[in-house]
Amino acid sequence: LNFLANSIANKLMGEGDEIILSEIEHHANIIPWQMVAEKYKLTINYVKVNDDFSLDLDDLSSKLSSKTKVVSIVGESNLSGMLPDIKEINNLVRSNSDALLIIDGAQLVPHRKVDVQDLGIDFLVFSGHKMLGPTGIGVVWGRKELLNSLDPVYGGGDMIEEVHYDKATWAPV
């Protein structure tokens, strides 16, 4: 999520743009956005959570605007087990903004079947250590056209198409 947040903010966001998170996010989905918000002078808005720990979708709808560039929401809460209606969130985001929809799947992916095409999301991120992998590794799934539109955060290896003294071009995803 750190790499994705930095790449999106660097390429697709500008001063005054907005990020929407929820009040029930794990800190792993808060801190990267706080860091890019400070660096790029962005605003973070938080969607309220209802008494049953579900997301207040009316509040989400009211916060979406032309300034909203990212909505990054937990796929399953590590606090309550709450499963947000990702399809409904996707419908709200698409109807009220041009924002990217990112799902933090760290708790979701190890326990449930996830069909990213059916959900209609733009990105899904999850960590390896939640599936007994080593700490510090993770996965970013993204729509191919979006991945190709972003600049890499780090360079090297097979990601290079051509290298010249004055510039490099990136290999397609």
Which residues fall in each region the model found?
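Pyridoxal 5′-phosphate
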Residues: 1-173
